[in-house]
């Protein structure tokens, strides 16, 4: 029976062609870091500082999701931890299963995300294994990083700024099939070329924090900061603060 390890081994060999990737068998299951809906109440009455993610996070096999239009299945070579991951794992400020339920009600395709488990993680660097209908910019074998914003782009409000789209969500936090796993499901418009000079780990680290800092501080719809401005960065030691 095929498993994901043969895919990762092929990629790491360094001499695998796109045709080789296309011919690899994608298994019907993979391993991921996940939360279980049955554990939602495990920290009830426990102070935030005493909630231990090691008690809620599980490493388990889950079914490989079917690809929908505009989506890509990625072999994850590296991922990253951020506050979304911590919040998810301690069910604060709310359980992420509420996000999955609400998302699942929006369309038959989104219903795939409403499951009794949640594969989390909002960063990755990896290799495109398969693409869904309508994806033309990416093909199997492409090395990519994924940013965290999952957006439907059906509302005109998001055409100028996707942060204003009423259906924008954080992938792996408000959606399922996140990056802390062997495989991940993303929208193809989340993908960017992996910089060739970066390792997998280096490429996987900045996605969420870098894009968040840029959007909020530098972009025309953010604070409009520019070189030479004198600013105070509150909490500058973390990932987001460091990029800020």
What are these regions (language model features)?
Residues 7-24, 40-78, 83, 111, ...:
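A short N-terminal beta-strand-loop micro-motif at the entrance of redox/enzyme domains
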Residues 10-11, 39-55, 92-114, 154-167, ...:
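Charged, glycine/proline-rich intrinsically disordered loops and linkers
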Residues 26-33:
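Short structural boundary motif marking the start of a folded domain
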Residues 30, 142, 228-230:
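Nucleotide donor/acceptor-binding cores
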Residues 63-80, 93-155, 195:
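Glycine-rich beta-strand-centered segment in the early N-terminal region that forms part
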Residues 92, 151-161, 175-188:
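A structural motif shared across PLP-dependent enzymes of the aminotransferase-like
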Residues 185-193, 197:
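Structured surface patches comprising rigid loops and adjacent beta-strands/short helices at the edges
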Residues 198-244:
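Mid-domain Rossmann-like dinucleotide-binding core that forms the NAD(H)/NADP(H) cofactor-binding site
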